[in-house]
Amino acid sequence: MKIFLTDISDMNDDIMNKGLKLVPAYRKDKIERYRFMEDKERSLAAGLLLNYATKLYSIYMSYAGEIELKTASDDIFNVKLDELVKSYDTSYDYNIEYAGNGKPVYSGLDIHFNLSHAGTCVVCAVSDRPVGIDIERPRKNAIKVAERFFTQAECDWIGDDSLRFARIWTLKEAYAKLTGDGIAGTVSKVEFRHETSANMASVVNMYISGKKADNIKIYELNIIKQKYVISAMEYIKN
C-alpha cells in the first residue's frame, strides 16, 4: 500500500480552474453538486490526488523490482496541489464502477484505491489489494460517542483522550471502507485492542465478533501536523 496526501490550504482560483478542466466528467458533476466552496475544493483535490496516486502506482507496478516508490518517511507522499495539476495525466483516469456494496473500484484492474478527507487534508490509499483509509481530527466530547458505539475495552483504553478516540474511530472507518459494508454495520462488531507483542512492542490487533483477524494489515499514521490521525488497512496476501 502507498498513501498520498494533499492539503487544500493552497487552493486558489488558478488551481481550481485548471483542475476542473482536467478531471473526468463524473468528478466535475460531483463537484458541482456541492453547495459550499470548501467541499468543492476537497472534491477537486480528491480527483487530482487519485489521478496522481494511480499514475505513480501504475508505473511502480509496471517496473516492480526495478524501481522503488519511497518517501522520506516511507509512510506517506505529501504532494502539493500545483504538482497534482502539473502531473495530471488523463490516460490514468481509468473507468470506475461500483461494487455490489457501493464501493467504487477500477473496472477490470488490479489497482485498488480509497479516499478520505478531513479539514484541509485529503488522503488516498492505493494497493494491488482492496484498501480502506480514514483521516480525522481529534475532537472534544468524543467519549460520549465512544460509550455509545465502542466496546468497554476500547472505552477503557481511550479514557478522556481525544487522540486515542480518533485512533479507534479511524480504524473502524478504515475497516468499514475496506469491506464496503459501511460504518453502521461494522462499528460495534469490530474491536481494536492495543496489545503487547512477543518482542514487547506495542501493536494494534483487530477482533471481529471476538475472533482475532489475521488477514488484514493495519497502518496507523499519527499525527500529520499534530492535527490529524490517519488509519489504513489492506488484506494480507495468502
Model feature map: region roles:
Residues 1-238:
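Core catalytic alpha/beta fold that binds nucleotide/phospho-ligands
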